[in-house]
Structure formats: C-alpha cells, structure tokens
C-alpha cells in the first residue's frame, strides 16, 4: 500500500509557500520603491554636478561647426560645373511607373 500524505501537512506546506511568496512580493516591492526614491535624489545630485561644470568650450565648438556649414566653400563656377543647371532636363507628363 502506498502511504498517503496527511491533509494537515499538505495545508501546512501550502500556507508556508504562500507566506514565502507574500514575503518575497513585499520585499521586492520595497526594494523597487527604494530604488525609485534614490533615483530621484541622484537626479538632483547630477544637476548640482552639472551646474558646477563649465560647458563653454563645447558651445564654442558647436558655433564653429554651424558657421562652417553656413559659409559656402564652393564658388558659383565650380557649383555650376558639377551641377550643370543649364543642361538639366526634368521629365514631364504622367509617371510611367503608375498604371
């Protein structure tokens, strides 16, 4: 004959596992809420560090690259040589790819 488990031991194991599950769930919720609170404080700390840092060298580089983009490096003759606007033909009429 096979030995049947007692109903009390089965209920004891179920209650023990459920208590363990609830404990783990509460501890997980507490650690994630603590991390979120510490993340908010660390953002304030990062703002303080950023306020003490001098960003002007980076801003000067940004202005210089914008000026280089705005100034034309090619003359009109060279530009006309590469992109010959006089000989450019644009097709007109219906698009042959659309039926």
Curated annotation (Swiss-Prot):
One of the GO BP terms on file: regulation of cell differentiation
Source taxon at top rank: Eukaryota
Coiled-coil ranges per UniProt: none
Family named by the database record: Belongs to the CLV3/ESR signal peptide family.
Name the UniProt record assigns to this protein: CLAVATA3/ESR (CLE)-related protein 11
Keywords attached to this entry: Developmental protein, Differentiation, Glycoprotein, Hydroxylation, Secreted, Signal
One GO cellular component, as annotated: apoplast
Entry-annotated residues carrying Hydroxyproline: 91, 94
Listed GO MF terms: receptor serine/threonine kinase binding
Signal peptide: 1-31
Record: glycosylation sites: 94
Keyword Secreted: yes
Keyword Glycoprotein annotated: yes
